[in-house]
Amino acid sequence: MNKYEIMLIIDPAIDMAMANEIVESVFDKKNINKVVKLENSTLAYPINKSSKAQYVVYTLEAKSELIAEFTRRANIAKFIWRQMVINLDTEKGFQRSKKAFKHRIAKDAKVANKGTGVKQLIENLEKTMSHKAKPSFKKEVKKSN
C-alpha cells in the first residue's frame, strides 16, 4: 500500500461531509490518516461560474486500484470541481529535500573552516582596489573629547 495525498476543490455551498462520504466509501476510515479542511478561498479564475471554493486535503494509504476508483467517482460527483492525487512514495523530491539540506550544511561548514579571516579578506580587497578610490572597510571610532 502506498501513501497518497488527495486535494479536492469542492463547491462552497456543499457541506464537507459529502466529500468525506465519497472518500470514505472508496477507502476505509482506518486508511485515512489525516483530513484537513483549508479555508474557503477566492479562485484565480471562476470554476462553474463561482469565484470561491473549499479546499480539502486527505492523507491516506491505499492501493492504486482504489485511486482509480476514487478518480472515477470524483469525476461523476458534480460538487467536486477538481481533484489532484499525489503518490508520496514515488514523488520526486518529497524525501530528497532533507538529504540535500543536510549535505548543504556539511558543505557550508567545510568552507567556513577553510576560509580566511575577515581581516585578510579586507586586506586582499584593498590591494586589488589600489587603482580605484579605496573605500575604507575598517571601523572608524570617533573619539569624543
Swiss-Prot record:
Residue ranges crossing the lipid bilayer per the database entry: none
Domain of life: Bacteria
Cited Pfam families: Ribosomal_S6
Entry's Gene Ontology molecular function annotations: rRNA binding; structural constituent of ribosome
CDD domains for the chain: bS6 (cd00473)
GO (cellular component) term, any one: ribosome
Keyword line: Ribonucleoprotein, Ribosomal protein, RNA-binding, rRNA-binding
Biological processes per GO annotation: translation
Protein family: Belongs to the bacterial ribosomal protein bS6 family.
Function: Binds together with bS18 to 16S ribosomal RNA.
Protein name, as recorded: Small ribosomal subunit protein bS6
Species of the source: Mycoplasmopsis agalactiae (strain NCTC 10123 / CIP 59.7 / PG2) (Mycoplasma agalactiae)
